Swiss-Prot record:
InterPro entries: aa-tRNA-synth_I_CS, aa-tRNA-synth_Ic, Rossmann-like_a/b/a_fold, S4_RNA-bd, S4_RNA-bd_sf, SYY-like_C, Tyr-tRNA-ligase, Tyr-tRNA-ligase_bac-type
Record key words, sorted: Aminoacyl-tRNA synthetase, ATP-binding, Cytoplasm, Ligase, Nucleotide-binding, Protein biosynthesis, RNA-binding
Function: Catalyzes the attachment of tyrosine to tRNA(Tyr) in a two-step reaction: tyrosine is first activated by ATP to form Tyr-AMP and then transferred to the acceptor end of tRNA(Tyr).
This protein's name: Tyrosine--tRNA ligase
Gene name per UniProt: tyrS
Motif ('KMSKS' region): 229-233
Source organism (scientific name): Streptococcus pneumoniae (strain ATCC BAA-255 / R6)
GO molecular function, one term: tyrosine-tRNA ligase activity
Membership in a protein family: Belongs to the class-I aminoacyl-tRNA synthetase family. TyrS type 1 subfamily.
Keyword set includes Protein biosynthesis: yes
PANTHER family membership: TYROSINE--TRNA LIGASE, MITOCHONDRIAL, TYROSYL-TRNA SYNTHETASE
Length: 418
């Protein structure tokens, strides 16, 4: 299958410039293309993965990727469809984020092998040395204010106010495309659908300043079956950095995907063939309660982002916590699996009687409730049911001398640390 058709079949093309010309270019030989990543945090998140994996698919088809990290544009801030002005960051902060993001991209693109190995670029390399006068004379003169204000991303901000700093952002992104075309013969840009206005500013600059044709592919902004923006868990972004979102948390995110989204997400976020995904779809629809599509999705994406060992660890944590086998997990695994649950620091001189601890830690509101829970068998210490009111936690209950896991009922976990 032609790479363009495969991208379409997987639901990865939202909008393009001249589709016929782009398809022809991809058929006739190697195309150099780029995707830009502005450092707005110290990590990329799942929302970025759609463009990253689209870039990887094109590389696997023989085309040459350039990964542009916006050391300059990250200092300015993209206004596209944002309700308010971004806070400006210091150069040191942005530089640190650039390095983090460059490291993450190397997991997905091949920067080492073949004539189409990926190339990392930073737009601070050309913007850092250009003077304001040169910027206005050599770039700004090709953009009319009418053209710039016609962009939907700008229109939405006119009423609330937009600074000249952010207004000029589209010119900067347009110039990125121009520089990469002149220096590396890059003719295609890939980005999110919210970037269409900025990306076509690049094709316009290429046409007017160099009489060349540039192409654009936008990938869709992914939403779930309810229309909710994809890539957040409990309102928080799902990060690619394991220190910010653990492999276990990412695994759980994919396992909780709705049935209506699971097969579609397999096409977007995995490298399984379309035939393999069709087989999974048939099995999944025959027995949706077995959640085959979610299991495969979680396995493939966690392995892709964090590696096979991290996936196996996340799966083991899931299985042991479900079975209540707390003692089968290391403290490191428990910290990953129980991140975000209520945590209570036990003082050295504290009364370690189970009833007293349940109240002092805030697990229950009263001694009466604590006694009822214990007597009714609703309290577990490290997976073991405790029904004695006079039970006192000992050193044996301190896993690796660091923590104790309390469970109340079937699912409510609490961690005591020492």
């Amino acid at each position: 299958m032609h790479i363009f058709d495969e991208l379409k079949e997987r639901g990865l093309i939202f909008q393009t410039t001249d589709e016929e010309a782009l398809r022809k270019a991809l058929e006739e030989g190697q195309v150099s293309y780029y995707t830009g990543y502005d450092p707005t945090a110290d990590s990329l998140h799942l929302g970025h993965l759609v463009a990253i994996l689209t870039s990887r698919r094109l590389q696997l088809a023989g085309h040459k990727p350039y990964a542009l990290v916006g050391g300059a544009t990250g200092l300015i801030g993209d206004p596209s469809f944002k309700d308010a002005e971004r806070s400006l960051q210091t150069k040191d902060t942005v530089d640190g984020w650039v390095k983090s993001i460059q490291g993450q991209l190397s997991r997905f693109l091949d920067f080492e092998n073949g004539e189409n190995k990926a190339v990392m670029v930073n737009n601070y390399d050309w913007f850092g040395s250009i003077s304001f006068i040169d910027f206005l004379r050599d770039i700004g003169k090709y953009f009319t204010v009418n053209y710039m204000m016609s962009k939907e991303s700008v229109k939405k901000r006119i009423e609330t106010g937009i600074s000249y700093t952010e207004f000029a952002y589209q010119i900067m992104q347009g110039y990125d495309f121009f520089v990469l075309n002149q220096d590396h013969n890059v003719t295609l840009q890939i980005g999110g659908s919210d970037q269409w206005g900025n990306m076509t500013a690049g094709t316009e600059l290429l046409r007017r300043k160099a009489d060349k044709t540039g192409h654009v592919i936008t990938v869709p902004l992914i939403t779930d079956a309810t229309g909710k923006k994809f890539g957040k868990s409990e309102g928080n972004a799902v990060w690619l950095n394991p220190e910010k979102t653990s492999p276990y948390e990412m695994y759980q995110f994919w396992m909780n995907v709705m049935d209506a989204d699971a097969v579609r997400f397999l096409k977007i976020f995995t490298f399984l063939s379309l035939d393999e995904i069709e087989d999974i779809r048939k099995q999944f629809e025959a027995a949706p309660h077995e959640r085959l599509a979610q299991k495969v999705l979680a396995r493939e994406v966690v392995t892709l982002v964090h590696g096979e060992e991290a996936y196996k660890e996340a799966l083991n944590i899931t299985e042991q916590l479900f079975a209540g086998n707390i003692k089968n997990l290391s403290v490191k695994e428990l910290k990953q699996g129980l991140r975000g649950v209520p945590n209570y620091q036990v003082q050295a001189d504290e009364n370690n009687n189970i009833v007293e601890l349940l109240v002092s830690s805030g697990i229950v509101n009263s001694k009466r409730q604590a006694r009822e829970d214990v007597q009714n068998g609703a309290i577990y210490v490290n997976g073991d049911r405790i029904q004695e009111l006079d039970y006192v936690l000992s050193d044996a209950d301190k896993l690796e001398n660091e923590l104790t896991v309390i469970r109340r009922g079937k699912k409510k976990y609490f961690v005591l640390t020492y």
